[in-house]
């Protein structure tokens, strides 16, 4: 997993607190120039994993590499290549924004002659110009989050760990922050933990899904979608008798189940939702069986959304109405 192009690498990483196993044999990597969305329900182990990558807690077993450095034996070297925004940003409320960022720059070892330029860069990137002389305790939650993001960007680190970076932001700020992350991810490695699934679809090249401390899947959103097509759905509108339509479709090879209900507009047209397997030609077989006896108004194969895929992996039955 660990190679010159790999910026983050976890190799068989486990974490135990007392007798409790929190993380189980986790192996995955993030390459330079890649944004990976890190998804999982609350308590899945996302924050613990990020804290191990950041060096804030150690793995019980396995190895963590950041920019090629072993976090267990080369912690200081690894930390120089790392920017981290925890879910609760590490802010000093009594400091002004600019003073806080100067302090972080000093802690990160940024050369004195480069500090002013670095502050200008992150202040502009995070749209903090209006609050640079304001004490942090006077800032809104959205601005506090942006200050936290700014400190993680200081020093232009190779690796960026972001734990819920858009929490507390309004829609406009979310869009701006998303663009900052997207641009940063073009030449750096970003691991992004979020509950906002559209955010993952918009800016992440790959998605890692974790639950109960175990990695369940890691692939591109499109790859996860293709893998989920073995339990896909076909929907159609047909004018015909309910039970006869149901029986005709259920008899087709590849149809797992059928849900028939009156159309929402109150007409005699039936809305039919078919749970099908991945075999080729299933839509054509359904269309032929229906159109030969009744009037077929519409037929389409529904692609699973990232939300559907996520819910299936973590064991929550998805709402069939949300697939589109």
Model region roles, listed by residue range:
Residues 2-4, 274-324:
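C-terminal coupling/interaction segments
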Residues 5-10, 15-211, 215-217:
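ABC transporter nucleotide-binding domains
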Residues 11, 237, 261, 300-302:
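Solvent-exposed beta-strand sheet faces enriched in polar/charged residues
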Residues 119, 137, 263, 303-304:
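Conserved beta-strand edge residues that scaffold enzyme active sites
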Residues 127, 255-261, 295-300:
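A short linear hydrophobic-aromatic micro-motif
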Residues 178-274:
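ABC transporter nucleotide-binding domain
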């Amino acid at each position: 997993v660990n190679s010159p192009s790999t910026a983050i690498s976890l190799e068989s990483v486990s974490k135990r607190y007392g007798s409790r196993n929190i993380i189980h044999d986790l192996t995955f990597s993030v390459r330079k120039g890649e944004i990976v969305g890190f998804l999982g329900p609350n308590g899945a182990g996302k924050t613990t994993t990020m804290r191990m990558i950041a060096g804030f807690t150690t793995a019980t077993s396995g190895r963590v590499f950041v920019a090629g450095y072993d976090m267990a034996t080369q912690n200081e070297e690894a930390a120089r290549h790392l920017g981290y925004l925890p879910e609760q940003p590490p802010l000093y409320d009594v400091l002004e924004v600019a003073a806080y960022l100067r302090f972080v720059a000093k802690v990160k070892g940024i050369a004195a002659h480069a500090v002013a330029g670095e502050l200008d860069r992150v202040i502009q990137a995070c749209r903090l110009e209006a609050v640079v002389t304001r004490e942090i305790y006077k800032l809104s939650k959205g601005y506090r989050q942006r200050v936290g993001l700014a400190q993680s960007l200081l020093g232009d680190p190779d690796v960026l760990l972001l734990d819920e970076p858009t929490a507390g932001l309004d829609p406009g700020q979310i869009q701006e922050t998303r663009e900052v992350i997207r641009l940063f991810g073009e030449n750096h490695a970003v691991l992004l933990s979020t509950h906002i699934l559209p955010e993952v679809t918009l800016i992440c090249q790959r998605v890692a899904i974790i639950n109960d401390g175990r990695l369940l899947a890691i692939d591109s959103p499109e790859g996860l979608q293709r893998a989920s097509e073995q339990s896909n759905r076909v929907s159609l509108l047909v004018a015909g008798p309910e039970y006869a339509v149901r029986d005709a479709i259920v008899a087709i090879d590849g149809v797992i189940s059928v849900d028939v209900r009156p159309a929402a507009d109150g007409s005699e047209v039936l809305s039919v939702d078919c749970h099908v397997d991945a075999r080729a030609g299933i839509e054509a077989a359904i269309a032929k069986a229906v159109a030969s006896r009744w009037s077929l108004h519409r037929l389409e194969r529904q692609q699973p959304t990232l939300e559907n895929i996520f819910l299936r992996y973590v064991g929550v039955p998805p709402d069939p109405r949300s697939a589109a």
